[in-house]
Structure formats: C-alpha cells, structure tokens
C-alpha cells in the first residue's frame, strides 16, 4: 500500500472546532471551524460527502423548531451557507461557508460545520462525492 492508496479524508474534531484535510497520509490543511451548539450538536461518526453545490440555496430543515417560519434564502450575501455546500450522509448536516466569521472556532451552528468562505471554497475544490468524513469528539 502506498500513501496515494489512502485517498482524501476529512476529520472534524467537534469539541475543539477543528477540521483536518488529508490527502493520503499527508495533512494538507487544518482549519478552525464552527460546530453545533450544545442543543444542536454536530453528529459523531463516519460519514461521506454526498452532494456538492456551488452558490447553494438555503432551505429551512423540515421539522426543525429553530427554523419554523423561515423562508428559503437564495444565493448571495445574505445566504447562511456562503458560496459552497458539501452535504454529508447525515440529514440536514453539511460543511459550508459562512458570512458569520465571528462564529468560527466556537460551537455556534445548528449541527453543520461552518468554515470561512474562502476556506470552504478551497476544500470544495479538493474533495469529491464519496470523500470520507470522520467526526470525532476530541
């Protein structure tokens, strides 16, 4: 087995709000991110990227109390997803940019993983549908 056999992997350390991007055995980049609030924790486990969207629409998650009465938000500066969405195999959870840079480094979301917009764009360009995503506590 060679380093290239290992492929691309994202590891998110939920409690320390860090996202690590590996290409093979090599750590390419580490990012500070925002993860879920205690009332809306980012799920732990092994997932994978299932969708990639440029300039996504934001839709209120069905059945979410916090989103009741909210309207969809089109792409643009007011969109809470920024310019990129990487949906993972956990309902309504993804990795995305955020216009709220002050939230980075904190537990501040409703379960998603927020990144600075430029960093989400960087990651988006390097991962594929099927890329593994491991979300661990520490």
PLM segments and residue spans:
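Cell wall/extracellular polymer interaction/catalysis modules
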Residues: 1-56
């Amino acid at each position: 087995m060679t380093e290239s056999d290992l492929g691309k992997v994202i590891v998110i350390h939920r409690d320390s709000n860090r996202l690590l991007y590996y290409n093979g055995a090599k750590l390419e980049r580490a990012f500070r991110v925002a993860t879920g609030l205690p009332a809306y924790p980012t799920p732990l486990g092994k997932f994978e990227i299932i969708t990639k969207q440029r300039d996504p629409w934001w839709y209120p998650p069905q059945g979410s109390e916090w989103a009741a009465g909210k309207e969809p938000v089109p792409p643009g500066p007011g969109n809470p997803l920024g310019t990129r969405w990487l949906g993972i195999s956990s309902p309504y959870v993804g990795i995305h940019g955020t216009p709220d840079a002050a939230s980075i480094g904190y537990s501040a979301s409703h379960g998603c993983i927020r990144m600075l917009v430029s960093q989400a764009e960087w990651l988006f360009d390097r991962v594929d549908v099927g890329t593994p995503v491991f979300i661990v506590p520490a």
